[in-house]
Amino acid sequence: MVEEGTMERLRTLGTLGTGIGWRPEIADAVERMPGIDWVEAVAENVCPGHLPESLLRLRARGVTVVPHGVSLGLGGADRPDEGRLAALAERAEALGSPLVTEHIAFVRAGGALTASPLLEAGHLLPVPRTRDALDVLCENVRIAQAALPVPLAVENIAALISWPGEEMTEGQFLYDLVERTGVRLLIDVANLHTNHVNRGEDPAKALDELPVEAIAYVHVAGGFERDGVWHDSHAHPVPQPVLDILADLASRTTPPGVLLERDENFPEPGELERELGAIRKTLEKAGTRAGASAGAAGAATRTAAELTVAESTAVGAIAGPRRGGADAQAAPRAAGTEALSAASTSTPADPARQRLALAQAALLSALVAGTPVPEGFDRVRLGVQARALAAKRADVVAKVAPELPEILAEEYRPAFLTYAPGHPMTGGYRRDALDFAEHLLLAGRPEDAEARRRLRDWWLERSGPTPPSRHPAARLARATRRVLLRR
């Protein structure tokens, strides 16, 4: 159990029930599904001023919506970006959410701390379980807690690779994080299964070491195994081993909420409903009820159904406001801003940040820029991770710039996978799409003249802040010169 001093700084939050990840591709199906108590939406895919009609209808029916962030990089060496924190806060307020969630991961590295180019991973990468990394993570979490108008929960991630020289198990790392910050946990049982296959970690041992009273809710998802490596794809059915880990967790505590994640390769709605049914059945067999109310918990036994939320922040025990439904109250933004400012200018963890920054930059550079593999890492596994990052990058670029696979047809994917290793992403996926198109044009590709013309027109329309020139050939020539001068 977390020490009493931390528990005294926690408040009760209601249960969530059974939910599913809301995605635009299945929005209509989710609205029609019976027994959906709540949904989770990727925060970066929601615009606060133009909420999707589907989410508005769900909210009107009383369905809770939780924003789930993927780009904050709380496990990174840098302090959380104030703009990203503000954006996450806006989404929580717009959706009337009772909490927000993010990941224990780093997503970018380099920059000022290492005096090297900033690199984007385009994916969630594992944090080393060291005291340095824990110190940095704790401060970053406190900064986020001070900036957000609702409680924060953080998720354990799936990993293909292991850091050398780790000093703690995952359970110990999470326990200390909760003890020092009071942050809530989003436990992904599919990620525990991934780490079992890929890193030889025992899910039962991880659950033994977790502070289960800190669990906000649970993720369940599917994946696939290839050549002895488990890929947490969120594009395949939930396998039995993942349900078995869910049953183990549910036998220890009542999960306040359980959510099914599916991000790709969406099946018919009936299949998703059957997966939700399997989750409910698993919980019932474990002697729990996912939709139990907080009031059902006995006063003599503290369980995770008595969902608690930390009020500690980066500057001590400043109480952060809770927001949700009709009882939501305005956040004292001035106090939160002062807390964020104080945390952002503090320097106790700076030596740890610099050590972590160098380690993360070396790893990410090896993964996305082809630099030498840092000492102690498994070269084969890093190769698997590098290929997975490139493949995901190709998939996301195809989504944000669907014209590219349309123009390039079957040439798109092999061309991008050839391009990616020598051209790391530095400015987001839209910039990545433009850089990829520019790279092809400078190489005189594609060979088909009509496809090359269409690609050139697409690039010219999007490559600058000003409208396309009346002389596109001259503009392309100037851009070519800029690129050549950078070499």
Swiss-Prot record:
Disulfide bonds: none annotated. Residues 286-487 are annotated as: Unknown. Residues 326-348 have a biased composition (Low complexity). It holds the Pfam family MbnB_TglH_ChrH. Residues 1-285 are annotated as: UPF0276. Residues 319-348 are annotated as: Disordered. In the N-terminal section; belongs to the UPF0276 family. NCBIfam families: PRK05409.1. This is UPF0276 protein SAV_2218. It comes from Streptomyces avermitilis (strain ATCC 31267 / DSM 46492 / JCM 5070 / NBRC 14893 / NCIMB 12804 / NRRL 8165 / MA-4680). The lineage of its organism: Bacteria, Bacillati, Actinomycetota, Actinomycetes, Kitasatosporales.
